[in-house]
C-alpha cells in the first residue's frame, strides 16, 4: 500500500470516528520539507520518522475538521492529549459565539512555527492541545487536565506557550480561558491575547453602585440568625485585632442560655430582650494582667521599703540635727508648688497612670489604678486624659480651652454622658482630666471589628445616644463633634458621650431662646450641610444630623458620604435626588422597617428648619418601640 493510500485510510478513520478514540497508529508519511524556523525540532513518530506536516494532513481531512490545527506529532500523541474528551464520546458543548459573527476571538498573530499555538475561532469547535505533558506535567497519568473540559466548553480558548507577557502555567491558563469566554469583546494586542480580569467591571450607574456597596451581601461579615432560641452574635472565634476573621458575625443557638457559647457580643432572647457583652480590647486585657503583676510586685517591694525605713528611723531617732533637717525641708516644700507634690497628690487620689489606652489630636488617654487599703484593698480604675498645647497656642488660651471643656463636662450628670471627676495639673505643667473608665472601648472600634451591628443592637445604642443628646440640649449644651470615636461603651452595653472639646453653650440657665452659631468643626462625614455655609445655624440641628449618620454607620458599616456637599460628593448628590423620588435612597431603603426609614429621612433632612429635634426623635413611634438592654435602662 502506498503512502497516499495510508494517509487516505488515516483520514477516513478521523471522519468515521468523529474525533473518537483511535485504536491503531498508522505509519506517518515522511516529509522532505525543511524544518520550520524554530529552535524546537518537530517530534518523531515511534518508528523514528518525522511526522507529517499540517498542510499535508489538511488536504485529505474533511472540512468539519479544518478548525483543528494539529502540530507535527504522532496520532498517539493526539489521542493521549484528549484523554477523557476523546474517549468519552460526548458531543462538543455549544460554542460561545462572539458579539460579532464570524469574528476571531483572542487570536494571536500568525507564526511560521506550527508548534507556537493552537487556537480556534468563535464559530468553530474548540482546539485540542496536542501535547498534554507540555502544560500538565504535574498531573498523574489518566487524570483529566484542567483545561481539557474548559477548552471544549469555551470555544474561545487559546493556549499559548510560555513567553514574555503570556501566561503559561495550567492554573493561570484556566483563569485566562474563563476570562476570555466571559468577556464579549476581548481586546487583542499585537503580541497575543491580553490577560482579562475575572472581576466584573463596576457599573457606572450610581444606583447600581449604591446597591452593591451597601447591599448586605457585600458586607464582609454576614448575619444569619435562625431558630427561636437566643441569637448569638460575634463569637469568640472572631479575631477582633485584625487579620483574617473566621466565621460569621452572627451564629445561632438553639437554647436561650447565652452561656452555651464561648463568648457572644450580643444575645437576643425569646422574650425580645437582649444583652451586650462587649469584651475589652486585647490591649486592655493585657493591661489588666500587667496591673495584677505590677501590684503583686509592688506589695512585696513596699514591704521591703517599710522594713528598711523603720530600720533607718531607728538609727536617726536620737539625732537632733537630722530631725531639724527633716522639719526644715518639709516647711520649704509647703511654701511653693512643687511638681513632685502635685504629682504625689494625684497619685494619692487616683493612683498612678499606666498604659495609654487612647490617642487624640492634642492629647492621650491613660488608665490610672487606685487601690484603697482601707476598703479591703478594693481597686478602682480611672481614665486620665492628658491635654497638650496646640502649636502656637498661648498658655492663656490653653488654660481657657481646658477649663471651658471641664466646666461643661463636669456639670453634666446623665447615664449616657461620661462622668468627669477632676482637673489636675501634673508635674510637667500639663492639665489632666480624670473621668470614669469605660472598658468596653468606643463605638468606632466595635463597628470596625463587627463589620456592622445587628439591627436590635444598633437600635439600642441609637436610643441611648438620642437620650443623651436630648439631655445635653435640655441643659443648653451642643456637642458639635458627635462621631463613633466619641461614644464610649461599657462592657454591659451602656453608651456614654465624651469629648466636649468643641462643645458650645447655646443657652444659659436664665435664657429661653437659643443662640445661633457659625463655623465649621467636627469630622467631615458627620458634618451637617449648613455648616459649610456662611450663615448662622442652630447647633442642636448639627448634633441631630450627626446622630443619623452614626446610625447608618452602625447598620451598614460604612459612611453614607465623604462630605455633605453636593458639588464635591456624588453620593450626597445622589441622596438629595433620590430622597425626593418614590423609590428613595437605596442605603436607607434597605432597612427593614418603614417607621425607621421615615424617621431617618427626617433626621437627615438637608434643611435644618425641617429637621427633627432630639425630643421629637425620642417621641417617634420607631424610637419608642426600641427595647433597651438592662444596662441602657440603668440609672433612669
UniProtKB/Swiss-Prot annotation:
According to the UniProt entry, which residue ranges have a biased composition of type Pro residues? 33-45
Q: Where is the composition biased (Basic and acidic residues)?
A: 1-11
Question: Which keywords appear in this protein's UniProt record, sorted alphabetically?
Answer: ATP-binding, Cytoplasm, Kinase, Nucleotide-binding, Phosphoprotein, Serine/threonine-protein kinase, Transferase
Question: Where Phosphothreonine occurs along the chain?
Answer: 238, 241
What's the catalysed reaction? L-seryl-[protein] + ATP = O-phospho-L-seryl-[protein] + ADP + H(+); L-threonyl-[protein] + ATP = O-phospho-L-threonyl-[protein] + ADP + H(+)
According to the UniProt entry, which residues carry Phosphoserine? 218, 299
For this chain's UniProt record, which GO biological process terms are given?
Answer: intracellular monoatomic cation homeostasis; intracellular potassium ion homeostasis
Q: Please give the Gene Ontology molecular function terms for this protein.
A: ATP binding; protein serine kinase activity; protein serine/threonine kinase activity
Subunit notes for this chain? Answer: Interacts with sty1.
Q: What is this protein called?
A: Serine/threonine-protein kinase hal4
Amino acid at each position: 500500500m502506498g503512502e497516499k493510500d495510508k494517509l487516505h485510510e488515516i483520514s477516513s478513520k478521523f471522519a468515521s470516528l468523529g474525533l473518537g478514540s483511535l485504536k491503531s497508529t498508522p505509519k506517518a508519511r515522511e516529509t522532505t520539507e525543511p524544518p520550520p524556523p524554530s529552535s524546537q525540532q518537530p517530534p518523531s513518530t515511534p518508528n523514528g520518522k518525522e511526522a507529517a506536516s499540517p498542510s499535508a494532513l489538511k488536504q485529505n481531512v474533511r472540512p468539519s475538521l479544518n478548525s483543528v490545527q494539529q502540530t507535527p506529532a504522532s496520532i498517539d500523541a493526539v489521542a493521549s492529549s484528549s484523554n477523557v474528551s476523546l474517549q468519552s464520546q460526548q458531543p462538543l458543548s455549544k460554542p460561545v459565539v462572539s458579539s460579532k459573527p464570524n469574528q476571531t476571538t483572542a487570536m494571536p498573530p500568525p507564526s511560521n512555527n506550527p508548534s507556537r499555538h493552537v487556537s480556534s475561532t468563535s464559530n468553530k469547535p474548540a482546539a485540542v492541545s496536542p501535547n498534554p505533558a507540555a502544560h500538565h506535567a504535574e498531573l498523574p497519568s489518566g487524570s483529566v487536565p484542567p483545561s481539557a473540559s474548559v477548552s471544549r466548553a469555551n470555544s474561545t480558548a487559546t493556549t499559548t506557550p510560555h513567553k514574555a507577557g503570556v501566561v503559561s502555567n495550567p492554573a493561570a491558563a484556566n483563569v485566562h480561558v474563563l476570562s476570555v469566554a466571559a468577556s464579549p469583546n476581548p481586546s487583542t494586542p499585537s503580541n497575543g491575547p491580553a490577560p482579562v480580569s475575572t472581576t466584573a467591571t463596576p457599573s457606572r450607574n450610581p444606583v447600581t453602585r449604591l446597591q452593591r456597596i451597601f447591599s448586605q451581601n457585600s458586607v464582609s461579615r454576614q448575619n444569619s440568625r435562625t431558630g427561636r432560641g437566643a441569637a448569638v452574635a460575634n463569637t469568640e472565634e472572631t479575631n477582633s485585632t485584625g487579620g483574617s476573621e473566621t466565621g460569621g458575625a452572627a451564629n445561632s443557638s438553639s437554647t436561650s442560655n447565652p452561656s452555651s457559647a464561648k463568648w457572644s457580643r450580643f444575645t437576643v432572647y425569646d422574650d425580645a430582650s437582649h444583652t451586650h457583652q462587649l469584651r475589652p480590647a486585647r490591649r486592655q486585657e493585657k493591661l489588666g494582667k500587667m496591673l495584677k503583676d505590677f501590684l503583686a510586685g509592688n506589695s512585696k517591694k513596699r514591704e521591703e521599703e517599710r522594713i528598711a525605713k523603720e530600720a533607718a528611723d531607728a538609727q536617726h531617732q536620737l539625732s537632733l540635727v537630722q530631725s531639724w533637717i527633716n522639719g526644715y525641708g518639709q516647711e520649704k516644700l509647703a511654701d511653693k508648688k512643687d511638681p513632685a507634690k502635685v504629682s504625689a497628690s494625684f497619685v494619692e487620689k487616683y493612683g498612678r497612670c499606666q498604659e495609654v489606652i487612647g490617642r487624640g489630636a492634642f492629647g492621650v488617654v491613660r488608665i490610672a489604678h487606685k487601690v484603697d487599703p482601707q476598703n479591703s484593698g478594693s481597686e478602682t480604675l480611672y481614665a486620665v486624659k492628658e491635654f497638650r498645647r496646640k502649636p502656637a497656642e498661648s498658655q492663656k488660651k490653653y488654660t481657657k480651652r481646658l477649663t471651658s471643656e471641664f466646666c461643661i463636662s463636669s456639670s453634666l450628670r446623665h447615664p449616657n454622658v461620661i462622668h468627669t471627676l477632676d482637673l489636675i495639673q501634673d508635674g510637667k505643667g500639663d492639665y489632666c482630666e480624670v473621668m470614669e473608665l469605660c472598658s468596653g472601648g468606643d463605638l468606632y472600634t466595635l463597628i470596625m471589628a463587627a463589620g456592622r451591628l445587628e439591627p436590635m443592637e444598633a437600635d439600642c445604642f441609637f436610643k441611648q445616644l438620642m437620650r443623651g443628646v436630648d439631655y445635653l440640649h435640655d441643659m443648653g449644651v451642643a456637642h458639635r463633634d458627635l462621631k463613633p470615636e466619641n461614644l464610649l461603651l461599657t462592657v454591659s452595653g451602656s453608651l456614654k458621650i465624651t469629648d466636649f472639646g468643641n462643645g458650645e453653650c447655646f443657652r444659659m440657665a436664665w435664657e429661653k431662646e437659643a443662640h445661633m452659631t457659625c463655623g465649621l468643626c467636627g469630622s467631615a462625614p458627620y458634618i451637617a450641610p449648613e455648616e459649610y455655609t456662611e450663615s448662622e445655624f442652630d447647633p442642636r440641628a448639627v448634633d441631630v444630623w450627626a446622630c443619623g449618620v452614626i446610625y447608618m454607620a452602625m447598620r451598614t458599616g460604612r459612611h453614607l458620604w465623604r462630605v455633605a456637599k453636593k458639588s464635591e460628593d456624588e453620593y450626597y448628590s445622589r441622596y438629595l435626588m433620590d430622597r425626593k423620588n418614590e423609590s428613595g435612597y437605596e442605603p436607607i431603603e434597605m432597612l427593614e422597617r418603614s417607621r425607621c426609614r421615615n424617621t431617618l429621612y427626617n433626621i437627615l433632612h438637608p434643611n435644618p428648619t425641617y429637621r427633627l429635634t432630639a425630643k421629637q426623635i425620642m417621641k417617634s413611634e420607631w424610637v419608642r418601640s426600641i427595647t433597651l438592654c438592662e444596662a441602657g435602662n440603668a440609672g433612669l
